[in-house]
Every structure is written in structure tokens, then in C-alpha cells.
């Protein structure tokens, strides 16, 4: 936020103050030096999503999200979604500053996927709680929201999930991707093909099911041994 204000606020005094505060922060956290506002928001989202203590230690103790709407207000969040919602908020900020930030868009797809899976996993025990149910209802269309991000974004999100061992998000994305597949040719390094050889059996199974739904095995330039999916 300081980087954003230091570059874009109309008041020069505010810009100068923000730049000074940003300089002090980057002197302490040197890995943030030279990064633009969108990059910094993305990095914050990545740290939240990874559960990094570096950012969790500074998170608000109450399980609420703060926002500005004719004054400072807050919104309660279920405990199981709190860190994911912080990550989501930062990813949206990254896209607000720079709508072409493809890495932020891909991370957002993974965040929404993880929110949906986490909520579904707790539905049997938490269902009936008013706050939980309100968020569960809001996530009912999560697959459609993720699908609307398009094939390039989902491909990048799947690749990032495989690289980081984010198995739950990978399985969710593989379930959604057949809905937006446009018939593009696959290559051996495409994340869908890579998923068929992932160390996790659940991801391999999700990839196998996705390939069946693509109904386009002939387009694969290199098709792995199907007997290897569950080994």
C-alpha cells in the first residue's frame, strides 16, 4: 500500500511521507527493495497463502477483514478461511494496481480453489453455523469463478500448484480445466501432462480423469503410460 501511495497519490506531501516509510521498510526487508506496488501485493499474497509466520505474526488478532466504505469497517471471517481471505485480498490488490499481473491472477485461482476445498471439508461438522454457511454459500460458484479466468491462467495456476506441492488446488484446477479447454495442442511440459506424473496419487488420478474429459488424447504429443497413474 505504501508503494502504491508513494507513486500515485495526488498530494505530494502524502507521497513523500509514504516514500519515506517505504524506504524504512525496504531497508529492513531488503527482498522487497525495487519492487512495484503490484509485485509487493503479490508477494504479500504468496506469503499469506504459504502460511508464512513473517506475515501471520502481524495479522490482526481478531478474525476480521478490514475495509473502507464510508469509514473503516470490518467483516468477520470463519477461522478456517482467515489466512486465505487475507491472501485473496492481497491478490485482488495486486490485480487492481496491475490488471495484467498474470502471476497474481494464477494465485487467485489457487486461493479460491483452496477456499472451496477447505469449506467443503468442514461442511459436515460446521454446517448450521451462520457465519460458516454464509461463506459456504458464497463459494458455491467457486468452480465457475475459477473457470472464468480462462485456460492460460488455469494452466499457469496448475503449473504453480505442481511446483509448490499444492495438491488440493491442483486437483481442483484439473476438475475445472476441461470446462474451458479449447482444443489446444498439449506438449510434454504442459502442466496437465506433468500432473499425470506427479508424485501424489490424487493429483495423478485427477489428471487422468481430466484427460478422459478432454476427449483429446490424440492431441498429446507425448502420452504417459496410463498404468503409471496410480503407481
What are these regions (language model features)?
Residues 1-4, 15-24, 139-148, 160, ...:
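Structural detector for internal amphipathic alpha-helices that build alpha-solenoid repeat scaffolds
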Residues 1-5, 154-159, 189-193, 226-231:
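Buried hydrophobic core positions in alpha-solenoid tandem helical repeats
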Residues 15-26, 39, 103-129, 144, ...:
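TPR/TPR-like alpha-solenoid helical repeat scaffolds
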Residues 99-103, 200:
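Residue-level recognition of tetratricopeptide repeat
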Residues 38, 102-103, 167-170:
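Helix-start (N-cap) detector for alpha-helical repeat units in TPR-like alpha-solenoids
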Residues 4, 8, 24-28, 47-54, ...:
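Positions within ordered alpha-helical repeat solenoids
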Residues 31, 36-39, 43-93, 114-148, ...:
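Short coil/linker segments at helix-helix boundaries
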Amino acid at each position: 500500500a505504501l508503494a502504491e501511495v508513494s507513486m500515485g497519490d495526488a498530494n505530494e506531501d502524502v507521497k513523500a511521507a509514504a516514500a519515506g516509510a517505504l524506504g524504512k521498510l525496504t531497508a529492513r526487508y531488503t527482498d522487497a527493495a525495487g519492487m512495484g506496488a503490484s509485485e509487493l501485493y503479490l508477494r504479500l499474497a504468496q506469503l499469506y497463502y504459504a502460511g508464512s509466520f513473517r506475515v501471520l505474526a502481524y495479522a490482526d488478532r481478531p478474525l476480521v477483514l478490514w475495509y473502507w466504505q464510508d469509514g473503516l469497517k470490518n467483516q468477520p471471517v470463519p477461522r478456517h478461511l482467515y489466512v486465505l481471505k487475507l491472501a485473496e485480498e492481497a491478490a485482488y490488490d495486486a490485480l487492481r494496481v496491475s490488471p495484467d499481473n498474470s502471476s497474481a491472477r494464477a494465485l487467485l485461482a489457487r486461493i479460491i480453489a483452496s477456499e472451496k476445498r477447505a469449506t467443503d471439508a468442514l461442511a459436515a461438522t460446521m454446517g448450521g453455523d451462520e457465519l460458516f454457511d454464509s461463506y459456504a454459500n458464497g463459494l458455491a460458484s467457486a468452480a465457475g469463478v475459477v473457470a472464468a479466468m480462462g485456460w492460460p491462467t488455469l494452466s499457469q495456476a496448475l503449473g504453480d500448484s505442481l511446483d509448490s506441492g499444492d495438491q488440493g488446488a491442483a486437483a481442483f484446477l484439473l476438475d475445472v480445466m476441461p470446462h474451458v479447454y479449447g482444443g489446444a495442442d498439449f506438449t510434454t511440459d504442459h502442466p496437465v501432462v506433468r500432473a499425470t506424473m506427479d508424485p501424489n496419487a490424487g493429483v495423478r488420478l485427477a489428471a487422468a480423469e481430466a484427460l478422459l474429459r478432454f476427449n483429446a488424447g490424440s492431441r498429446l504429443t507425448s502420452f504417459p503410460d496410463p498404468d503409471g497413474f496410480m503407481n
